[in-house]
Amino acid sequence: MDIPTHYAQQYASTIQLLLQQKGSRLRDTVMFQGITGAKAAVPVDQIGLVEATERTTRFPPITPGNTPTDRPWIYPSDFDWNDLVDSIDKLRVVTDPTSALAQSGTYAMGRAQDRVIIRNYFADRKTGVEGGTTTSFPAGQQIAVNFGASGNVGLTVAKMREAKRLLMAAEVDLETDPATLIVTAKQHDNLLSEIQVISLDFNEKPVMVEGMVTRFLGFNLKHTELLATNVSTYRRCPAYVKSGMVLGMWNDITTDISQRKDLAGLPIQVYVYGTFGATRLEEKKMVEVICAE
C-alpha cells in the first residue's frame, strides 16, 4: 500500500493581523467637529482676554473696548487604501480574507488620523479672517531636553511638573479640561525608573495598571510609536488639554466592499477612505516635552 499518497495538506483556517497600532489612540483626546462642503473651515471663532476698568470719577464717558478676536483655520487631507481579492484566490484558501483586509484598512486609517493630529500639533497654523496669519509653535511652550538635569535626559517627573506648571500659569482649567501626555515606549520606560511614579509613598493610589502608567500628575498617558523627532533626533512629546486641539472630519472612515466588474475574475475590492484635518486652537494649551532616547 502506498501510504504517502494519502498524506494530506492542512491550511490555516484563521487569519491573523500582524503587529500594528490598531486604529486611532488620540482621536478621543482632542475636540471633534464634523465639517461639510468646504475646502477649509473655521472650527470656532475666538474672543480674547479683556480686563475691567476701574472707575475713578462720577459719570465718566463710556469708551468702547477693543476686544481681540481670532479665527483658526483647518484644512483637509484625503487618505485612502485598497486591495483586491481575486475570485480564483478565494477558491484556493480556507478562509475568505475580505473582512480581515477591511479591518486592516480601517486600522491604517485610524493611524492616519493620529499622524494628522501629531503633525498639526507642531506645524504652523493659519489664523485670521481669511487664514492669512501664520502662527508657529511658541518656544515658550517647549520644555528643553536637559530640563531639570545636568545633561540631556528622557521623560522625567520634573518635565511633567513643568508641563503642568505652564498650563496652570496660562489659566488652563485642569479640573474640567482633560490633559493628555503622549509617549512612546521609551518615555513610558523612563517613568518606570522614577521613584515618584512607581512608589506608593508618593501616590495615594497606584498610578500603574498591570505595569502600565496610565495617569500621573493629572495627565492621562497615551502610548503611540508615531511620535516624530526633531532635527536633533530628540522625541517631541505633546502635552495638552482637549480644548486646545481639534480634529475636523469632512468624511469619517468609510469602508466599501464591492465587486470590480472591470477586471478579469471579477475580484472583490476592499476600499477604505476618509478626509480629515487638525489644528491647534490655542498655543497656551499646548506644551512640547523634548526627550532624549
Question: Can you annotate each of these PLM segments?
Answer:
Residues D2-T29, Q33-T53, P60, T67-Y75, ...:
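Sequence/fold signature of self-assembling virion shell proteins
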Residues Q9, S13, T95-S99, A158-R161, ...:
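Generic alpha-helical secondary structure signal
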Residues E130-K205:
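Extended, solvent-exposed, turn-rich assembly/linker loops in the middle of proteins
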Residues V44, P68-T133, E171-A185, L221, ...:
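Long, contiguous amphipathic alpha-helices that act as assembly "spine/axial" helices in icosahedral shell
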Residues P61, I118-F122, V287:
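Flexible domain-boundary/linker segments
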